[in-house]
């Protein structure tokens, strides 16, 4: 399957399944102490940057002995509140990747999602993002993610580009990111329920197309991974679990 066909299929299936209401996550609870083989673990924590992931990687990721770790991180690293300079971000990402792959887990690194700048700039000072602006900083972060994936021979999925193409990033009610029309919030960063369905579907197709492990998957990241914190509600790990079950 060519990349364009893969992208087109993801968009078509997401639209069809989302409209039909066919994507529902089943009940699930994680228990690393039991030693049970879990299908998908939601290890996303709101507000995390790469420094935070390094502090909790042993307990929240490696303790599950993952067959596959999916890591999406960098949105908080590029913002002023939890800023991590690009060189440090690269170093952190290398260390995280080395620990994960050194444990025997396969690694899938994903780009960070786009955002609606007018909303973002109500929470973060515009001067902080100069000279390249918020979108320019995101491009730079995603370039680092791609380069580290290549350096470590990890899988790489530019899921952010899919959101840019079909996500209607802005103020429309059917945007895949939260806004005033669809959630009564000036968010512009976090996915809507349909956005999480789309993300789960796109990731599941990437995993299956590239024959990555489909058991003991740890989704490791920040609030975009976390969603509602579950694997049976509104999060991409929840929809991923359903699709791979």
Task: Write out the residue ranges for each language-model feature.
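Alpha-helical cap/lid subdomain in secreted, periplasmic
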Residues: 33-39, 52-217, 231-245
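Conserved donor-binding loops in enzymes that form glycosidic bonds
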Residues: 45, 189, 193, 222
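Active-site metal-binding loops of divalent metal-dependent hydrolases
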Residues: 75, 222-223
């Amino acid at each position: 399957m060519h990349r364009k066909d893969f992208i087109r299929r993801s968009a078509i299936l997401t639209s069809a399944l989302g409209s039909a209401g066919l994507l529902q996550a089943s009940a699930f609870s994680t228990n690393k102490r039991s030693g049970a083989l879990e299908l998908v673990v939601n290890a996303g924590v709101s507000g995390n940057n790469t420094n935070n992931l390094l502090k909790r990687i042993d307990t929240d990721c490696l303790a599950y002995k993952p067959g596959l770790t999916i890591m999406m991180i960098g949105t908080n690293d590029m913002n002023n509140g939890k800023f991590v300079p690009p060189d440090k971000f690269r170093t952190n990402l290398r260390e995280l990747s080395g620990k994960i792959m050194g444990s025997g887990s396969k690694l899938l690194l994903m780009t960070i999602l786009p955002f609606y700048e007018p909303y973002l700039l109500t929470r973060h000072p515009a001067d902080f993002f100069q000279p390249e602006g918020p979108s320019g900083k995101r491009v730079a972060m995603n370039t680092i993610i791609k380069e580290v994936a290549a350096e470590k021979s990890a899988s790489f999925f530019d899921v952010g580009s899919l959101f840019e193409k079909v996500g209607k990033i802005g103020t429309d009610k059917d945007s895949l990111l939260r806004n005033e029309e669809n959630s009564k919030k000036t968010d512009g960063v976090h996915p809507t329920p349909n956005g999480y369905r789309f993300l789960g579907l796109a990731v599941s197709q990437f995993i299956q197309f590239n024959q990555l492990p489909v058991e003991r998957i740890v989704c490791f990241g920040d609030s975009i991974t976390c969603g509602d914190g579950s694997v049976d509600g509104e999060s991409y790990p929840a929809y991923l679990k359903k699709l791979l079950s």
